[in-house]
Amino acid sequence: MKNPALLKEIKTYRGRDEVPEDFDAFWDGEVKKVSTLPAYQLEERDFCIPQVKCYELTFEGTNEGKVYARVVLPKSEEKVPIIFHFHGYMGRGWDWADMLAYTVSGYGVVSMDVRGQSGYSQDGLRSLLGNTVKGHIIRGAVEGRDHLFYKDVYLDIYQLIEIIASLPQVDEKRLSSYGASQGGALALVAAALNPRIQKTVAIYPFLSDFRRVLEIGNTSEAYDELFRYFKFHDPFHETEEEIMATLAYIDVKNLAHRIKGKVKMITGLDDDVCYPITQFAIYNRLTCDKAYRIMPEYAHEAMNVFVNDQVYNWLCGSEIPFKYVK
C-alpha cells in the first residue's frame, strides 16, 4: 500500500479548525424552524414496472426553494425500509432504473435533486429552474451563516426525511443514507441532523475541512470557487478568518459528532478532488459505530469493482461475495 506517511497522518487527523461554540445551538435552532411537516405533493407515476410503485415528491424548502425527489417503493403489505440517495456536486438524483436494484431486497429508495443543480429542484434565488452553480460553497459566506446556500440544502434533507418517515407504507425505524462526493457529505448530514437515519455510506465525502482545502491550494472543479473567491475578490486574504468562521457552520467534519447511527466510509487514496486528509477529518470526529475502506489505486472516480456490491450488502443485509467466484 503506497504513501505510508499519508496513511499514518489520516488515522489521527481531525481537521484544521475546531467546532464553533454555538454550532449545535445554531443547528438545533434551524431544525426547530422546519420541524413542522411541510405541505407536499406525492404523485404516483405508472411506468409499467411490476411489483414497484414510483412517485414524484415535491415540497417547498427554506427560502422559497422547490425540492424534488424520486421515490420508488416495492409493493408490499409490510412497511418498507428506505435508502436516501444523494448525488454529486452539479449533478442530479438517480434515474428511475438506478433505484430499482434495492427494491429487489425489499427496500424503497428516495433520490433528491439538490436545489440549483442539474435536476428538477429549484433554487430559491428567484425560483430559478436549473443550474445555478458554480458558487454554491461560497454563496452567502460574506453575508453570514444565515445566508449560506448549503444551510438550506441541509434543511431540505431534514424535511425530506420527515416527509418520507411520515408515509404509512414506510418503516420509519429503518432509514439509511448513501452517496458519493457531495452525496457522501449530504448522506452524513442526513444522519447528523435527523437521528432517524440508522446507517450511512459515504464515499469520498465533499464539504469538509475548508481551511485545509485552502491551504492545499485545491483548484479542482469542485473546490475552485473557494480558490477563485480569494484570487479575484480578496487576494490579500483580509476576510479569510471571517469566511472560514462562517463556512464552519456547513463543514461536515463539524457535524460528525452529532451522528448516532452506523457509518461506513470509502476513500480512494489518489483522490485529488476531495483529498483523503479532509475526508478523515470527518471520520476521526465520528463517535458512533464506524468503519472505513481505503482503495489505494483509486482517485475521485467511479468505484465499480466490488464497491457497489459491498454497499448493497451493508445497506440491505445481503451476502454478495467481494471476490470473483470461480
Where are these regions (language model features)?
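Acidic catalytic loop of the alpha/beta-hydrolase fold
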Residues: L269-C274, E301
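Gly/Ser-rich "nucleophile elbow"/oxyanion-hole loop immediately N-terminal to the catalytic nucleophile
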Residues: H136-S181
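Cap/lid segment of the alpha/beta-hydrolase catalytic domain
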Residues: W94, L100-T103, Y107-L155
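N-terminal cap/lid segment of alpha/beta-hydrolase-fold proteins
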Residues: K33-E77
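Histidine-bearing beta->alpha loop at or near hydrolase active sites
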Residues: I294-Y312
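Short beta-strand/loop motif that positions the catalytic acidic residue
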Residues: R258-I259, M265-T267, D271
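N-terminal targeting or regulatory segments adjacent to alpha/beta-hydrolase or S9 domains
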Residues: M1-V52, Y324-K326
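Hydrolase active-site cap/lid region
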Residues: V189-H237, I294
